[in-house]
Regions:
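Charged, amphipathic alpha-helical regulatory modules used
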Residues: 1-85, 653-660
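Catalytic-loop motifs flanking and including active-site residues across diverse enzymes
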Residues: 5, 9, 194, 447-451, ...
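Short, intrinsically disordered, low-complexity segments enriched in Ser/Thr and Pro
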Residues: 22, 481-488, 661-666
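Conserved catalytic cores of very large enzyme subunits
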Residues: 82-440, 461-462, 466-624, 628-633
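Contiguous, well-ordered alpha-helical segments that form the cores/surfaces of helical PPI scaffolds
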Residues: 200, 444-457, 478
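Core of folded catalytic or high-affinity ligand/protein-binding domains
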Residues: 436, 440, 446-447, 453, ...
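Long, charge-rich boundary regions
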Residues: 625-666
Length: 666
C-alpha cells in the first residue's frame, strides 16, 4: 500500500520503459485523475500498475506495456496450488516447497513469453504451431547426460567451494557422490539427469566384491536416486540409468578410472565380468522395489542391446530384465544397431565429431531445450490435396521451432557467461581446468507430434491402415531430418529430432486445431467418427488403438521413424493377463534383430490400496488383499507412472483405447 504520488509514476515509467518525460507526465496525470474520481480509500501498487498498463495500451505503446507488465498469478490460482484443490497426476502430493516451485514456474512461464522469446515465437506457441516445453524452466537446460567418470575423477563439488569432497575410494561413497550430483543437477535442468554405462563405469570400484556386497551397492543406488523427490517438494525428477551387457564400443579401450580418481592401468573391457555381475544385481534390486514394493519413483533403467548379444547368459539376463519390467515397469530396451548409434542415442551427438579426442571424465552433454511441432497443423494450413504445400508448411514449422531454440540459447549463454557467480554456476564450473559443460556439446530437440493424424488428413488412412500412409509418414520424417541438418549447418548448432514426453501437449494441439481449423468432410478432409480427434498420437507412433501385434507395431514404427528420433520407443501396453517374462524376452529378441526399432517399453498398470497399502500388478476396482474400494490405479502417461484419477479426460480416453498385450497376443 502506497501513498499516491504522481511523480513516482513518472519515475517508474522512465526507469522501466524509457518513456519520454512529457508522455510519462501525461499518463501520470491521467492516472491521478482516475484515482481522484474513484474516491478509493486505499491505492495499492498493484492497482496503480494495472491502471498504468491500461493507459499504455490505450496510447498504443505495446513495447512499453510489455516492459512495464507485472508478472504473477490470480489469488484463486495461488489458493488452488497451495491447497492442491486440483488433482495431481504424480504419486506424491506437493509439499510447501513444491507449491512454491509451482508458483515460481508459473511466473517464469509469463516471463519467458514476454521477455525471452520474440513476439512471433511467443505467438506460435500460444496459437499451437509449436509447443515450447518447460517454459517454467526458461533459465535452465532441458536435460543433461554424462559419464560417471566425471564424478569419479573429481569427486562431488558444489559451486563457489560451498562444499566439496575428494574422489571416492569406496563404492558406497561413490554411490553417495552420484546421488548428490544427480540431486544437484536436478536443480539446474528440468528434465532427466542421465548417467551413461553405469555398470561398466562403476566396475573398477566393485572388483573383488561378493554377490551380497554387489546387491547392497545396487540397492543403495536405486533407493537413494528414487528419494531425491523429497528435495523437490514432491515434484518427481527423472534419473535415467544406462546399462550395457557388452561394453560400449566407444568405452571399451578407454583407460578405466578407479578408486581415488586414479587410473587402474586396465581398460573398461577388462572389467566385463564384474560389470555383468553388477548388472544382475541392479535388476535384482530394481525388481524388489522400495519398502512398499512400489516401483522406484523417478528412475528409468535403459538396457542397451546390440546385434552381438547372443550368448545364453544374455538371454537369461533379458528374462530377468523382462520380469523386472512386468513387476515394476519403467524398463526401456534400447537397440544399438550400430556402434555410432550406441553413442548418439545417449549423448545426442556423434562420437567422432564431439568426444573422440576427449577423456571420459569430460563426457557431458546437455539438451538446451525441447520444442514440439504440430504436424497436423501443416495439413490444416495447406489446401486439400496440395501435398507440396504440406511440406512447405512443415519447413515453416521447423524454422519457427529453430528460432525459438536460438532465442533460448542466447538467453542461457548470457547466464552461463556469468560463470560461478551466476545462476548456472554448477554448469559453468571448471573441472580439471576445463568447463564442465561445453557449448559445443549442447543440442536442441525438435519433437514431431501427430504424424499419424497428419497422415490421416493427407492420405485418408492412419499409419497402420495402409503402406501408402506409412510411406508418406516416412517421407515426412525424412524431410524433418533433412531440415534439422540444414538448420544445424545454417546456425552452427545441433538440432536433433526427438520424441517428446511432455504431458498435455498432444491434447493441447488437438484442441487448438479443432478451434482454429474446424474442417469438415465437405472441405476435402476425411473424417473418422470412430477416431475422435481429442488427443493427437504422440511423435511418429502408430495409434494406440491399432489392433496389431507388438512385433508388427515395432516393425512399422521403425520403418516410419528410420532411426531419426532420439528416445523413440515402441509402447507395449500390458493388460491384467500378463505375458510371462520368457514371452516378453522373445519379443525383445525378435525386435532387436529387425534393424529398425530404436526402443521398446512394456508398461503394466498397478493398483495401490489407500487402506492397507497393498500394491498389485493390474488395474482393479478393489484391493486384492483387504477388499477395500479405496484404490488408485497407476499407469504410464507419456514416460512416467502417475495416478489415473488425475489425468485429463482426453488422456483417460486414450488409455481406454489402448490395445492391451497378453501372453496369447505374443
Amino acid at each position: 500500500i502506497v501513498v499516491f504520488d504522481a511523480r513516482r509514476i513518472v519515475e517508474s515509467l522512465r526507469l522501466e520503459t524509457g518513456l519520454r518525460p512529457e508522455l510519462a507526465q501525461r499518463i501520470a496525470q491521467d492516472i491521478e485523475a482516475i484515482v481522484r474520481q474513484s474516491a478509493l480509500r486505499r491505492v495499492t501498487s498493484s492497482l496503480l500498475r494495472t491502471l498504468i498498463d491500461a493507459k499504455l495500451i490505450e496510447y498504443g505503446l505495446d513495447a512499453e506495456y510489455r516492459a512495464h507488465s507485472r508478472l504473477g498469478l490470480p489469488i484463486t490460482d495461488i489458493d488452488r496450488i497451495i491447497k492442491q484443490a486440483n488433482q495431481r497426476t504424480t504419486p506424491l502430493p506437493l509439499t510447501p516447497e513444491g507449491t512454491g516451485l509451482e508458483i515460481a514456474a508459473a511466473i517464469k512461464r509469463e516471463y519467458a513469453l514476454l521477455a525471452v522469446f520474440s513476439a512471433p515465437v511467443a505467438e506460435a506457441h500460444l496459437v499451437g504451431d509449436i509447443f515450447i516445453q518447460d517454459l517454467g524452466a526458461i533459465d535452465r537446460p532441458y536435460a543433461i547426460v554424462q559419464s560417471p567418470d566425471v564424478v569419479k575423477r573429481y569427486g562431488f563439488t558444489l559451486p563457489n567451494r560451498f562444499a566439496a569432497s575428494r574422489p571416492a575410494r569406496h563404492p558406497e561413497v561413490l554411490v553417495a557422490h552420484l546421488v548428490k550430483s544427480s540431486a544437484a543437477l536436478q536443480g539446474y535442468v528440468n528434465g532427466a539427469v542421465e548417467w551413461d554405462a553405469v555398470n561398466f563405469s562403476l566396475a573398477p570400484y566393485l572388483d573383488g566384491l561378493g554377490e551380497r556386497e554387489l546387491l547392497q551397492v545396487a540397492e543403495a543406488l536405486m533407493f537413494e536416486l528414487s528419494a531425491t523427490a523429497v528435495g523437490r517438494g514432491g515434484n518427481l525428477p527423472t534419473c535415467v540409468i544406462h546399462l550395457d551387457w557388452q561394453v560400449p564400443p566407444y568405452l571399451a579401450e578407454r583407460p578405466a578410472i578407479g578408486p581415488g580418481g586414479n587410473f587402474t592401468g586396465r581398460t573398461y573391457q577388462d572389467y566385463r565380468s564384474v560389470a555383468r555381475r553388477f548388472l544382475w544385481a541392479l535388476f535384482a534390486a530394481y525388481r524388489d522395489g522400495d519398502g512398499q514394493k512400489l516401483p522406484f519413483s523417478g528412475i528409468r533403467l535403459v538396457l542397451h542391446a546390440t546385434p552381438q548379444d547372443a550368448d545364453p547368459e544374455w538371454q537369461t539376463l533379458v528374462v530377468k530384465a523382462c520380469r523386472a519390467s512386468l513387476e515394476r515397469g519403467n524398463v526401456w530396451f534400447a537397440f544399438d544397431h550400430t556402434p555410432d548409434r550406441a553413442f548418439l542415442s545417449r549423448f545426442g551427438l556423434p562420437y567422432a565429431a564431439s568426444f573422440a579426442e576427449a577423456a571420459t571424465d569430460e563426457w557431458c552433454a546437455a539438451a538446451f531445450q525441447a520444442v514440439a511441432i504440430n504436424l497436423p497443423r501443416a495439413a490444416h494450413r495447406a489446401a486439400p490435396g496440395k501435398v507440396v504445400e504440406v511440406f512447405e508448411e512443415l519447413t515453416r514449422l521447423m524454422d519457427i521451432a529453430a528460432q525459438s531454440h536460438l532465442e533460448k540459447r542466447v538467453f542461457l549463454e548470457k547466464l552461463l557467461a556469468r560463470g560461478e557467480d551466476g545462476p548456472l554456476a554448477l554448469l559453468a564450473a571448471r573441472r580439471g581446468g576445463r568447463p564442465f559443460l561445453k557449448l559445443s556439446r549442447t543440442t536442441h530437440r525438435v519433437c514431431p507430434v501427430g504424424l499419424n493424424d497428419l497422415t490421416q488428413a493427407v492420405t485418408g488412412h492412419q499409419l497402420h491402415e495402409s503402406s501408402v500412409a506409412r510411406d508418406f509418414g516416412a517421407r515426412v520424417i525424412a524431410h524433418l531430418a533433412a531440415e534439422a541438418t540444414r538448420l544445424s549447418s545454417r546456425h552452427k548448432t545441433h538440432f536433433v529430432l526427438a520424441e517428446s514426453h511432455a504431458e498435455g501437449m498432444t491434447e493441447r494441439f488437438a484442441h487448438m486445431d479443432a478451434r482454429f481449423f474446424p474442417r469438415t468432410a465437405a472441405d476435402g478432409y476425411p473424417l473418422d467418427d470412430a477416431y475422435p480427434v481429442e488427443n493427437y498420437v504422440n511423435g511418429a507412433k502408430l495409434s494406440p488403438a491399432a489392433d496389431l501385434s507388438p512385433w508388427q507395431r515395432a516393425q512399422w514404427e521403425g520403418e516410419v521413424q528410420q532411426g531419426s528420433l532420439l528416445n523413440a520407443t515402441t509402447d507395449v501396453w500390458l493388460g491384467d493377463a500378463l505375458p510371462t517374462p520368457e514371452q516378453l524376452a522373445t519379443l525383445v529378441d525378435k525386435v532387436r534383430f529387425n534393424g529398425l526399432t530404436t526402443g521398446l517399453m512394456a508398461s503394466p498398470e498397478f493398483t495401490a490400496c489407500s487402506v492397507c497399502g497393498h500394491v498389485a500388478v493390474g488395474s482393479a476396482r478393489a484391493c486384492a488383499a483387504c477388499g477395500a474400494p479405496q484404490v488408485e490405479t497407476l499407469a504410464m502417461l507419456t514416460n512416467r507412472y502417475s495416478r489415473v484419477s488425475g489425468w485429463s479426460t482426453a488422456a483417460q480416453s486414450e488409455r481406454h483405447r489402448r490395445v492391451r498385450v497378453t501372453g496369447h497376443s505374443l
